Amino acid sequence: MKYKVRYEDNTSVNDWIDEYETEEAAENAIKEELENCKEYLQSLGYDYGDFGNKTEIWVPGGNEYASWERLWM
């Protein structure tokens, strides 16, 4: 079984679906990308959380966001 993750952000330019061999690899990729987004959005202030099969990060009151959806759940 492949573990697919869908990434989306407010720009719609870099949206993608990626496949991983294991659930652990997929979860590690989500964590790594989330950390990158935290660094990028640090100066704007951000909030983030897990909602069911999605992990999201956003700027409260702003347009910036990114999400990672676990498609195997």
Where are the language model's segments positioned?
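Short aromatic-glycine-(Arg/Gly/Cys) micro-motifs in beta-strand/loop hairpins
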Residues: 1-16
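Short beta-strand segments
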Residues: 15-18, 66
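Conserved aromatic
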Residues: 19-23
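Short amphipathic alpha-helices within nucleic acid-binding modules
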Residues: 26-30
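Short, mixed-charge low-complexity intrinsically disordered segments
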Residues: 35-73
